[in-house]
A protein has these predicted regions:
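Extracellular beta-strand solenoid repeats
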Residues: 53, 59, 66, 74, ...
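Right-handed parallel beta-helix
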Residues: 116, 171-174, 193-204, 227-238, ...
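Positively charged n-region of N-terminal signal peptides that target proteins for export
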Residues: 1-5
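Acidic Gly/Asp/Thr-rich repetitive segments characteristic of extracellular carbohydrate-active
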Residues: 26-55, 116-145, 150
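Extracellular beta-strand-rich solenoid/capping regions of secreted or surface-exposed proteins
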Residues: 59-71, 81-96, 128-137, 150-170, ...
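Sec-dependent N-terminal signal peptides
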Residues: 6-14
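Short glycine/acidic-rich loop motifs that flank beta-strands on beta-rich extracellular proteins
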Residues: 62-63, 82-86, 139, 153-154, ...
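Bacterial Sec-dependent signal peptides at the C-terminal "C-region" and cleavage site
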Residues: 13-25
Length: 434
């Protein structure tokens, strides 16, 4: 092949993979976008030493534009508007608004970004464009300023706001779920390592406005394969499922100083995780579909939950209080500690624990308002109860017993230390066939 032939091939390859219409079309095909493309050099001036200067508004005309690799967008008075912008390691230099109704895709290098960088976020799922500027390979700070932001599930199982590794997200505003009829969706999903979601903002689900009747998995915040993560200070309410769901082998999780109200299924579910702390939270008005507990520690089949601490948690007007259950398939619950909590239940047991290796219950106020047991423990290998104050209207004051179930063999409770728990009724070695 002569030099001209080689040169032709090189030029063709550059054209295919660069940000021209053909390259953009290939990019779109890879992620299933149906949108016309525009070449970046037709809407932007040529980069000057890797910098694209935006002095006047750039209208993408509702088309998709791929930026060249590694450029910096320097905003000096103008914004980019109306379309889809695909970054490729793109940096931003700006002290004001940058985008106006622009969908953000691709990869970016923006260590600090905010809703203030977007001129208009008055459209559903606009926050997905804000968090799309984050790069999981570098530390990110994302500020969601005061204001109302709507999110909308587009299909069953949709994630409205995905948060990835190395992100600090400060929520000051209110996120509202648009009513839908889906069985499951996730307003925010934390997936990755080293994530903080904090602030004094609010997340509101569609419990009272949901248009369907099936399902129970409309989650406010979900942890999925999340490690070294925390959620603090937030208000989360009216979720079709759980306000918070900790799942899929997450670890080193902190949920602190949050106010959870009117979860339909649970306040918090912990279904697959290790090293979880829930501290200083207030959980109220949980009810609508079973199990209806403030906190439910209940691993799915073949999953493990271990080393959970519930501390200084206040529960009021919930159908059930705290539930610990390790009886699903080959599920296992390791150690659960409950300390300095104020727990009240309007119907079910205030504290119910079944098939747990170690349960430590110390210095709690436990109240039962409807005739069920204050505390019911079954098949706990190591149980410690100290300095708890229990109150009840009628029925069993405290019920601690063996529970023998053929599927799990003869696991018997071993009472190690129960003291200062007031009037206590203990029934040992009682068998029950199910």
């Amino acid at each position: 092949m002569d030099k001209k032939g080689v040169l032709f091939i090189l030029v063709s390859l550059i054209e295919l993979f660069s940000c021209n219409p053909k390259g953009a079309e290939a990019w779109k095909d890879g992620i299933g976008i149906s949108q016309d493309s525009v070449r970046y050099d037709l809407v932007f001036e040529e980069p000057n030493q890797g910098v694209l200067i935006i002095k006047d508004d750039v209208d993408l005309g509702n088309k998709l534009c791929c930026l060249p690799k590694g450029v910096t967008l320097s905003f000096e008075g103008g914004v980019i508007k109306n379309g889809t912008l695909v970054g490729d390691g793109t940096k931003i230099d700006s002290h004001g608004p940058c985008f106006d109704r622009v969908r953000i895709l691709g990869t970016w290098n923006v260590p600090e970004n905010s809703t203030s960088m977007f001129k208009d976020l008055d459209y559903d799922n606009s926050l997905k464009d804000v968090v799309a500027l984050a790069n999981p390979q570098i530390p990110n700070k994302i500020v969601i300023e005061e204001g109302d932001y709507q999110v909308s599930a587009q299909q069953h199982g949709d994630v409205c706001i995905p948060i990835s590794s190395n992100s600090v997200v400060i929520l000051k505003g209110t996120i509202r779920m648009v009513p839908n009829d889906y069985t499951h969706y996730f307003i925010i999903r934390l997936n990755g390592r080293n994530i903080q979601l904090k602030g004094n903002g609010t997340i509101i689900g569609d419990k009272h406005t949901h248009t369907g009747a099936d399902g129970e998995w409309g989650m406010g915040i979900e942890f999925v394969h999340a490690h070294d993560v925390s959620v603090s200070g937030l208000n989360i309410k009216d979720c079709w499922g759980d306000c918070i769901h900790v799942a899929f082998e997450s670890s080193d999780v902190l949920i602190e100083d949050c106010r959870l109200d009117h979860g339909r299924r649970q306040g918090i579910s912990i279904t697959s995780a290790k090293n979880v702390t829930v501290r200083g939270c207030t959980i109220t008005n949980v009810g609508g579909t079973e199990p209806q507990c403030a906190i439910d520690i209940e691993p799915y089949a073949k999953y493990i939950v271990d080393n959970v601490l519930l501390e200084n948690v206040t529960v009021g007007n919930c159908i059930g209080g705290f539930k610990v259950l390790g009886s699903t398939g080959d599920a296992k619950v390791g150690t659960v500690s409950i300390k300095n909590c104020l727990i009240a239940s309007e119907k079910y047991e205030t504290l119910a624990a079944t098939l747990c290796d170690t349960l430590i219950v110390e210095d709690n106020n436990i109240t039962q308002n409807n005739g069920w047991a204050c505390v019911r423990c079954r098949s706990i290998n190591y149980l410690v109860m100290k300095r708890n104050r229990l109150q009840y209207n009628n029925g069993l004051f405290q019920h601690v017993k063996d529970w023998v179930r053929p599927a799990f063999g003869k696991k018997r409770i071993k009472l190690i230390d129960i003291e200062n728990c007031g009037s206590t009724k203990i029934v040992q070695n009682q068998k029950r066939e199910l």
